[in-house]
């Protein structure tokens, strides 16, 4: 790794102050590079290292995707099976296939917000009664949550047990959990003290202590079960191992690895593009600013973006992977609702968007994904393809 790359990474956390911690790994099926910058928390003197544990947020869907296609490869599931072929409790989804579900062919909705449920049973009751509409390409966590239930029914086994058996053990992962052991919390990155401005109220989320998933729906599972869409914690050392095994076709067949990222939703309608998704992942969008996938990469690339500041890109054609983990929620303002209120709060300071509250200056990280691409993803792609 050259010094120019390191400078770009450091700019994200030192100059732009988009997060207190940034860890990055990238490479191909044989070689890897690692970068660790910043501290585990702003009030923590300990620096990040390759084994520092991050909340993966929606990168957890990568694990879900691997398990689903492993079950397909075992001949126990087909993309053409309907949801109610497997589980008739999903009373409104009898015409939707597994392929439809995984590729966001329909918009799925619950009657109430899932994060407000008090327990897993209540949440699953809402999922069993989910309804759909003919809106293609609407991103949602619900498909991953539903497929988790279906796989458990098919295999008669807990989903995370399958992750342990088919991913964690063969990849020799050492820092990947849904429930982080107490003795490893001291090397876990903080996402606590996320701030949001909602209808002129400054709200602080101060209960996301180390080991608690940022995602509200996953919190319902209380680290006991995996929700399917979020809730896994891991490190760059583990994610590097996982990506290399994936690129070597040791987890899934080459045919399936090459099929996952193919666009199945995106199209141009009345001059505007819809969103581009593969199976539970982003696929390459024609317009870079809207694309989770770098434009120099292939049409077979899979990508995942995580709310807490993570990104995973794997291109099986160019044979490269990139994984970055950051804590862009930690002691930063992440959202202003309604968006129209943004201008009355945001002030530019040293090139960064900031917000003042009670004499304290906070960095506003709503635009994190653009800074992430500029400072991490795009420079790495240039480096790997050069």
Residue ranges and their predicted role:
Residues 2-54, 76, 342:
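Short, conserved catalytic-motif segment at the N-terminal edge
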Residues 5-8, 292-299:
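Short Pro/Gly-enriched beta-strand edge/turn motifs at strand-loop
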Residues 9, 61-64, 68, 101, ...:
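Residue-level preference for non-acidic, small/hydrophobic
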Residues 14-22, 44-101, 130-142, 227-230:
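Short active-site loop at a secondary-structure junction
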Residues 33-35, 311-313, 318-328, 334:
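Short, well-ordered beta-strand elements
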Residues 93-296:
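Short, surface-exposed loop or secondary-structure junction motifs
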């Amino acid at each position: 790794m050259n010094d120019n790359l390191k400078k770009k990474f450091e700019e994200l956390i030192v100059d732009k102050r988009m997060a207190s911690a940034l860890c990055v790994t990238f490479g191909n099926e044989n070689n890897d590079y690692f970068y660790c910058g910043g501290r585990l928390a702003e009030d923590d003197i300990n620096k990040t290292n390759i084994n520092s544990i991050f909340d993966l947020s929606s990168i957890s869907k990568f694990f879900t995707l691997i398990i689903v296609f492993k079950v397909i490869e075992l001949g126990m599931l087909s993309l053409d099976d309907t949801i109610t072929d497997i589980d008739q409790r999903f009373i409104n989804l009898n015409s939707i296939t597994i392929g439809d579900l995984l590729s966001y062919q329909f918009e799925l909705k619950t009657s109430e917000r899932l994060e407000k449920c008090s327990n897993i049973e209540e949440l699953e009751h809402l999922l069993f009664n989910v309804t759909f509409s003919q809106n293609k390409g609407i991103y949602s966590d619900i498909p991953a949550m539903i497929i988790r239930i279906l796989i458990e029914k098919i295999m008669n086994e807990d989903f995370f047990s399958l992750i342990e058996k088919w991913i964690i053990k063969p990849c020799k992962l050492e820092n990947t959990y849904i429930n982080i052991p107490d003795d490893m919390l001291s090397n876990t990155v903080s996402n606590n003290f996320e701030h949001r401005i909602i209808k002129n109220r400054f709200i602080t989320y101060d209960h996301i202590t180390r080991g608690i998933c940022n995602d509200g729906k996953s919190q319902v599972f209380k680290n006991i079960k995996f929700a399917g869409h979020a809730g896994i914690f891991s490190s760059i050392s583990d994610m590097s191992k996982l990506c290399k095994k994936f690129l070597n076709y040791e987890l899934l067949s080459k045919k399936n690895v090459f099929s996952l990222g193919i666009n199945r939703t995106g199209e141009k309608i009345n001059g505007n593009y819809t969103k581009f998704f593969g199976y539970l992942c982003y696929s390459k969008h024609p317009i870079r600013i809207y694309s989770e996938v770098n434009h120099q990469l292939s049409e077979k690339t899979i990508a995942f973006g995580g709310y807490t500041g993570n990104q995973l890109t794997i291109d099986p054609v160019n044979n490269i992977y990139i994984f970055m983990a950051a804590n862009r929620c930690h002691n930063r303002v992440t959202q202003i609702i309604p968006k129209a209120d943004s201008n009355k709060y945001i002030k530019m300071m040293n090139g960064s968007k900031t917000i003042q509250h009670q004499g304290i200056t906070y960095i506003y990280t709503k635009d994190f994904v653009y800074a992430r691409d500029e400072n991490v993803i795009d420079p790495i792609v240039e480096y790997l393809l050069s």
